[in-house]
């Protein structure tokens, strides 16, 4: 990795990040092998509370695999993942369920239920948690629609929504329980530039309004530059670069330049 030294592997509770408060996420020496293929080759990464981190890299380079590890949807071959001071590796499903309450996920597709209205989709996590009061559900959904700038859309079905609207509904559903952290899997994928820009603004607004920590997996460099406090470049299963957008743009490293300019030169993830 360039521009910043790698984080050391640890076996105790993660330390706080100087000047940025406590650590929301800390990944230590994370490895994942599927068959004979090494997907993750020793990831060391830390995300401060309230920070927005963008993870960039070539398609098939392990970005989404890393994201799934952060919520326990995949188990690593080796390494540790700490969420707010708790090592989630080896946790039971019940324990992981408690961790997942702290984390919202926006999947690339939005993952809406086709048979449910917008209101029902957004309220789904609350119903799953046992909330049954119609007034409470309507009030919380209305708040989310206001945040998403989708007032009056609660009775629509997903099939009638544009791609950008589906993303907003998916995001509203993922944050309705006020998680500490939101994970975004390619949030602007398949959107035109204007709609993508509106999603980027929304990600920043959520950080500012609710203080949410965000991890944004993307291959959209404009999105990464727009939303991120810090950018991590995943290359060949490792964090090759970890720094600010300015540091990334000013880097003369040939591997980074190839990625930014879209050149392959026989290299890739």
Predicted regions and their residues:
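Helix-to-loop junction immediately C-terminal to a conserved catalytic motif
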Residues: 71
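Conserved ABC ATPase "signature" region
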Residues: 86-87, 134-153
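Short coil-to-helix segment of the ABC ATPase nucleotide-binding domain corresponding to the Q-loop/switch region
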Residues: 116-124
């Amino acid at each position: 990795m360039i521009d910043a030294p790698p984080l050391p592997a640890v076996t105790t509770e993660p330390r706080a990040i100087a000047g940025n408060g406590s650590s929301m996420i800390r990944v230590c020496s994370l490895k994942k092998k599927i068959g004979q293929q090494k997907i993750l080759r020793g990831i060391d990464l830390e995300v401060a509370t309230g920070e927005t981190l963008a993870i960039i890299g070539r398609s098939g380079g392990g970005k989404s695999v890393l994201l799934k590890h952060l919520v326990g949807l995949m188990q690593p071959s080796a390494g540790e993942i700490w969420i707010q001071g708790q090592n989630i590796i080896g946790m039971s499903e019940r324990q992981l369920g408690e961790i997942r309450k702290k984390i919202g996920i926006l999947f690339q597709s939005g993952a809406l239920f086709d048979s449910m209205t917008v209101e029902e989709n957004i309220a789904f996590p609350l119903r799953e948690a046992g909330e049954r009061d119609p007034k409470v559900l309507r009030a919380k959904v209305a708040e989310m629609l206001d945040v998403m700038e989708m007032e009056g859309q609660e009775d629509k079905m997903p099939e009638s929504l544009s791609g950008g609207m589906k993303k907003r509904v998916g995001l509203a559903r993922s944050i309705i329980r006020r998680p500490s952290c939101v994970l975004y899997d390619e949030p602007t994928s398949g959107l035109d530039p204007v709609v993508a820009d509106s999603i980027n603004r929304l990600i920043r607004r959520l950080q500012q309004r609710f203080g949410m920590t965000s991890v944004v997996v993307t291959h959209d460099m404009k999105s990464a530059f727009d939303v991120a406090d810090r950018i991590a470049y995943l290359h060949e299963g490792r964090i090759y670069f970890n720094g600010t957008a300015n540091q990334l743009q000013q880097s003369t490293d040939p591997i980074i330049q190839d990625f930014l300019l879209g050149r392959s030169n026989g290299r890739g993830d």
